[in-house]
């Protein structure tokens, strides 16, 4: 069976996380509790999601010890100034009800703030023990290299799925031993109707979502954080950890990247690779 964790600079991270974007209120609390009870040990949230209080409640409701869980959150670029980074992080820790985050990311590039200032502030939080590791999100390859030259960037969270090639970003991640965390691994559901994934899934008595995730998780330094709206979907996604694709199957899925479908491209996004 494929490994359920990856090792980045000697630190083990669960490959498959539970994403909480657009999950708020009681739904956030219940879905996080359910995910942890199913066996997830990696939870992803963000200040911008407006659900950190409920995510923290779900963690406590699950009974899973904090030290068994990888917990990631993100600072919004409006808070990229040094004082704001610390203020945001302290509020996030309080809302989540934890003493330390495993990983804190800058959610998007902040063009009006020197990157060195933001990374130095994140590094200070790391030095003070408030976060274990620091990272970035939605950074194209050139910006990731710049960040990695300034600080020990642990992860870059970006959109990545079988319809979107991220070779340049992956290359930069490999150069600097940076984890790539894939969000929107199903391309907002578009992948789930793909005939190639359906054919491969049938051969393994699996589902297209499991094939999509297995393809990602087989790649070096890649983790994924799918969102799921039901217990059944969360369990289904977790089943991807037991699926191993043949090399020809992996290549067939990878060939779909020529579509270059990007689903997250707001007006403030950087120039992509």
Predicted regions and their residues:
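Acidic (Asp/Glu)-rich catalytic clusters
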Residues: 7-8, 56-68, 90-99, 148-150, ...
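Acidic-and-aromatic substrate-binding clefts and catalytic sites of carbohydrate-active enzymes
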Residues: 24-26, 46-54, 78-83, 111-114, ...
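Short, acidic/polar
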Residues: 24-36, 81-96, 140, 144, ...
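Conserved acidic residues
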Residues: 41, 99-102, 154
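Short acidic capping loops at alpha-helix termini that bridge into adjacent secondary structure
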Residues: 65-69, 99-104, 132-133, 209-210, ...
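Glycine/small-residue-rich loop that forms an oxyanion/phosphate-binding "nest" at active or ligand-binding sites
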Residues: 74, 78-119, 123
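Beta/alpha (TIM)-barrel catalytic core signal, keyed to glycine-rich beta->alpha loops juxtaposed to Asp/Glu
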Residues: 109-273
């Amino acid at each position: 069976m494929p490994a359920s964790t990856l090792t980045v600079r000697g630190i083990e991270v669960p490959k498959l996380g539970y994403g909480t974007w657009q999950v708020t209120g009681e739904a956030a609390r219940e879905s996080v509790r359910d995910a942890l009870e199913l066996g997830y040990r990696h939870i992803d949230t963000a200040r911008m999601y407006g659900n950190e209080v409920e995510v923290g409640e779900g963690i406590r409701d699950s009974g899973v010890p904090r030290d068994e869980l990888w917990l990631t959150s993100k600072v919004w670029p409006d808070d990229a100034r040094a004082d704001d980074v610390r203020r945001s992080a302290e509020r996030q820790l309080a809302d989540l009800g934890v003493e330390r985050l495993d990983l804190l990311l800058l959610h998007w590039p902040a063009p009006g703030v020197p990157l060195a200032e933001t990374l130095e502030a994140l590094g200070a939080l790391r030095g003070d023990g408030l976060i274990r590791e620091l990272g970035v999100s939605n950074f194209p390859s050139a910006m990731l290299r710049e960040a990695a030259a300034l600080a020990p960037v642990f992860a870059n969270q970006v959109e990545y799925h079988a319809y979107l090639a991220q070779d340049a970003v992956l290359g930069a991640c490999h150069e600097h031993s940076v984890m790539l965390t894939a969000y929107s691994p199903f391309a907002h559901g578009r992948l789930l109707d793909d005939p190639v994934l359906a054919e491969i899934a049938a051969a393994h008595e699996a589902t297209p979502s499991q094939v999509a995730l297995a393809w990602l998780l087989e790649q070096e330094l890649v983790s994924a954080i799918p969102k799921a709206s039901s217990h059944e979907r969360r369990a289904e996604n977790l089943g991807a950890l037991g699926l191993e694709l043949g090399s020809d199957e992996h290549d067939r899925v990878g060939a779909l990247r020529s579509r270059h479908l990007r689903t997250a491209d707001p007006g403030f996004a950087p120039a992509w690779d």
